[in-house]
Amino acid sequence: MLLSVPLLLGLLGLAAAEPAVYFKEQFLDGDGWTSRWIESKHKSDFGKFVLSSGKFYGDEEKDKGLQTSQDARFYALSASFEPFSNKGQTLVVQFTVKHEQNIDCGGGYVKLFPNSLDQTDMHGDSEYNIMFGPDICGPGTKKVHVIFNYKGKNVLINKDIRCKDDEFTHLYTLIVRPDNTYEVKIDNSQVESGSLEDDWDFLPPKKIKDPDASKPEDWDERAKIDDPTDSKPEDWDKPEHIPDPDAKKPEDWDEEMDGEWEPPVIQNPEYKGEWKPRQIDNPDYKGTWIHPEIDNPEYSPDPSIYAYDNFGVLGLDLWQVKSGTIFDNFLITNDEAYAEEFGNETWGVTKAAEKQMKDKQDEEQRLKEEEEDKKRKEEEEAEDKEDDEDKDEDEEDEEDKEEDEEEDVPGQAKDEL
């Protein structure tokens, strides 16, 4: 069967529009993940990941992911995929993070490595291409890292992107485009965007201060000056403190014993402080001198800042003080729309049910604590009542004893007689 040229071109166009999915991991095959993910042996005490949907979830099976399981540990785990380059195409990196342990200090980011990485020796100093994701440590650090390795140097973003710091699952997306622009999304909503060249210090500045320029000696930057016609009044200078005119030497003051009497000092009501001439507009004021700039001879544009020759490994290389973070729904693709749709079909489908389950657990815990508190108070009241009854019985016994002793006294006296 022969196809018409328009139809053939249409089919080719549809094929070209298909998204390229370089890596996708949802952990839907139970323990099958252990054959795809490799633990680093660089250190013997790396923390262990386990497959779990956590203490609360929207869908117990779909929400299963890699969970950190040991406190105060470094973690190093990675998965490889068919190597690719993002030259000439968009790169989208996406995954979900859930800090259900109410994390105090720890990473929730991923690293993209070239396929030359020795996965069994991956560690914190292993060279990567891109690092992306949330990082939390105390109240001061709650940011989304976006770090690019450019010519062997890790370059951090110049902006502060705040991450989510609650206990729920959140979707993190990094988009890097071939026009050297980028976008960061959290929960499929844009939180930052811009130019790679503007928001990272990849290149020397386009402009520099002219080294041959200097501020003229007669350049006056003072907006105000002292009024040369103003002078200090003759009666201005008064002491700040004066002897108290109302003070009197005590009658029992002995100058031989106490020394010469001096009245206490008080604030002088006529004291005016330091005199300063009034200010007037400076007739010679020229404004703040601005150093002129010239084109930087060291600057050279790089249209390929965004591009990497080789991506081949996604790794979790991080430190956590309190474990419990769950990573899931990893995706690396070249299609922004596909990534957004994938996020909606994973995180988007289960987020509401996850919150409902957490709210229900919190309510059950609240009621349990109220019941325990009520029971504790009742037990304390019962103990107090029992103590009061015992005290009353002791007092009655003491009174009976005293009465018995009083009755015995006359008989005792009679016997003595």
Swiss-Prot record:
Keywords: Acetylation, Calcium, Chaperone, Cytoplasm, Cytoplasmic vesicle, Disulfide bond, Endoplasmic reticulum, Extracellular matrix, Hydroxylation, Lectin, Lysosome, Metal-binding, Repeat, Sarcoplasmic reticulum, Secreted, Signal, Zinc. A motif (Prevents secretion from ER) lies at residues 414-417. The keyword Kinase does not apply. Residues 207-251, 352-379 have a biased composition (Basic and acidic residues). Ca(2+) binds at residues 26, 62, 64, 328. The modification N6-acetyllysine is found at residues 48, 159, 209. Residues 1-17 form the signal peptide. It comes from the Eukaryota. Residues 309-417 are annotated as: C-domain. An alpha-D-glucoside binds at residues 109, 111, 128, 135, 317. Residues 198-308 are annotated as: P-domain. Residues 252-261, 380-409 have a biased composition (Acidic residues). One of its GO terms (cellular component) is cortical granule. Disulfide bonds join 105-137. One of its GO terms (molecular function) is unfolded protein binding. Residues 259-297 are annotated as: 3 X approximate repeats. One of its GO terms (biological process) is protein stabilization. Residues 193-278, 350-417 are annotated as: Disordered. Monomer. Component of an EIF2 complex at least composed of CELF1/CUGBP1, CALR, CALR3, EIF2S1, EIF2S2, HSP90B1 and HSPA5. Interacts with PDIA3/ERp57 and SPACA9. Interacts with TRIM21. Interacts with NR3C1. Interacts with PPIB. Interacts (via P-domain) with PDIA5. Interacts with CLCC1. Calcium-binding chaperone that promotes folding, oligomeric assembly and quality control in the endoplasmic reticulum (ER) via the calreticulin/calnexin cycle. This lectin interacts transiently with almost all of the monoglucosylated glycoproteins that are synthesized in the ER. Interacts with the DNA-binding domain of NR3C1 and mediates its nuclear export. Involved in maternal gene expression regulation. May participate in oocyte maturation via the regulation of calcium homeostasis. This is Calreticulin. It comes from Macaca fascicularis (Crab-eating macaque). The gene is CALR.
